Amino acid sequence: MEPSNYYSDQDVEKCVTVGETVLSDHPDIDLIICPDSTALPGQLEAAQKKDLTKDDVTITGFATPNAIKPYCEAGALYNWGLWDCKVQGALGCYLAYYLASGNDVAVGDVIDVPGMGLVEILPNDCLVPGAPTAEVNNGVVLLPERIIFTAENVDDYDF
């Protein structure tokens, strides 16, 4: 599959259309990993329009639990993920405090975040090697965990 043919530009309506195209162009497809939080509900909507369930094609990606809950309840997918907003907020606040306290950071540094553990400052291009950035390797921190949502735990979250 050529990815540029199926990207929906994070446009909600286009996501459904792109999802329908993927399913039509590849009727024997077994797995679809959606690239963004609008693509996942769009792809699931497209699958439902074709009366497909998680037993017909595995669809997953990242999106909020509230956006995907109806599809989960309908049996359209097994699981999906997203970063934990509380962990993301806590990490961002602590790193802001850490920097405001006069600490400098550089790629390769490891910071002990209370209640979270060690996080490392990674090069900007750690996810996409060679990707252009405004400053070379000024650093990023990846979240240490993500939430995996399932039919069993989706009701535990409201966002």
Predicted regions and their residues:
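A residue-level marker of the well-folded mature domains of exported/periplasmic proteins
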Residues: M1-F159
